[in-house]
Amino acid sequence: MSKAIKLPQKLMLLGSGELGKEFVIAAQRLGNYVIAVDRYANAPAMQVSDCCEVISMLSADDLEAVVTKYEPDFIIPEIEAIRTEKLQEFEDRGITVIPTAAATNYTMNRDRIRELAHEELGIRTAKYGYAVTLEELIAVSDNIGFPNVVKPVMSSSGKGQSVVATKEEVEKAWDYAIANSRGDSQKVIVEEFINFEIEITLLTIKQWNAPTIFCSPIGHRQERGDYQESWQPAGISEDKILEAQAIAKTVTDALGGAGIFGVEFFITKDEVIFSELSPRPHDTGMVTLISQNLNEFELHLRAILGLPIPKIEQLGFCASAVILASEKLDAPLFTGVAEALAEPDVDIRLFGKPTAHPYRRMGVALAKAENVETAREKATDAASKIHISSQ
């Protein structure tokens, strides 16, 4: 893309969760036309889009039908479970796939992105191996050593991930990973357990006609492989920030295209270790809804459309904490919102998901304070005040 783009553009979002919802809101503010696609009706992004479609995104025929129907200018994947081979066909026909069809194919699978980073680009990662059967997993785990981390090569929001402390826990980890694998993959990755000081996400914005730029690193904490809270700034040294930026630029340059990438790292006392990469807004980056002048969704949109990003300003010590469901519910109701919002510099986002189940992310609390510790306390306190029920 070398010319100034004309608005509105027609954007097709593949996957319509809470990240997609905030992206659609950003797109609508600049008058764009958005088609939200997902496997179930009334997904969060569908609630704010111009129109929506319910399909299996693993079906090449279903994807062909919706793309033919709407003829979008851009196809923007928001999830992993997509028939990525079809995206290459769309790109060959002149539709812009974000970041590119090839990059999407790489990053939909942990094995491909890990091999790109470690084997092709020579970047330090945790030691790793793969397994497609329980017997292989036992052998690979013995080779990697204990404790280790087992994950599906394709999953959503960290689901299916577990820390395996002993050989006796391997079978349970296998069952959990396969049960939470997305798409048609039955393959798991086993990683060396890194004794890190902090995990960070470096939001990396790759532009069509301007240099790659970065947000301030975001610290985050996970449970069950899924993010629970995040904060910005992360509080790591300038030399480690520069090292993480150099690694992120190397990987995203290899992938190409444009848009925001959530690049995850383990930060140890002495090292910056590449972990994972998502070619889209990152769940931990929801803190930017309160912490930056331009949030990650606005940055993604500007990068996609080739619009300028003159400055990313970090607005102080901020944090986010997830609001999780504890039981299975249809048409969930929320109480405690008024109590949560009574605290200054606190905001709440409820995602509008039509159903709930244990540990499903239903919303997020956002907070700002005079330091990171207080911001984290305010966010988790606000999240704890929100209760989800059927009546």
Swiss-Prot record:
UniProt: Mg(2+) binding residues: E264, E276
Name its species: Nostoc sp. (strain PCC 7120 / SAG 25.82 / UTEX 2576)
**Subunit structure, briefly?**
Homodimer.
Upper lineage is:
Bacteria, Bacillati, Cyanobacteriota, Cyanophyceae, Nostocales
Enzyme class label:
ligase
What positions does the entry give for ATP binding? R110, K151, S156, S157, G158, K159, G160, Q161, E191, E192, F193, I194, E199
Q: Which GO terms describe its biological process?
A: 'de novo' IMP biosynthetic process
**Record-annotated ATP-grasp domain positions:** 115-305
Provide the family line.
Belongs to the PurK/PurT family.
| MF terms in GO | ATP binding; magnesium ion binding; phosphoribosylglycinamide formyltransferase 2 activity; phosphoribosylglycinamide formyltransferase activity
Q: What is its EC number?
A: 6.3.1.21
PROSITE patterns documented for this protein = ATP_GRASP (PS50975)
The name on file for this protein is Formate-dependent phosphoribosylglycinamide formyltransferase
Q: Where along this sequence does the record place binding of N(1)-(5-phospho-beta-D-ribosyl)glycinamide? A: E18, L19, E78, D283, K353, R360, R361
What does the protein in this record do?
A: Involved in the de novo purine biosynthesis. Catalyzes the transfer of formate to 5-phospho-ribosyl-glycinamide (GAR), producing 5-phospho-ribosyl-N-formylglycinamide (FGAR). Formate is provided by PurU via hydrolysis of 10-formyl-tetrahydrofolate.
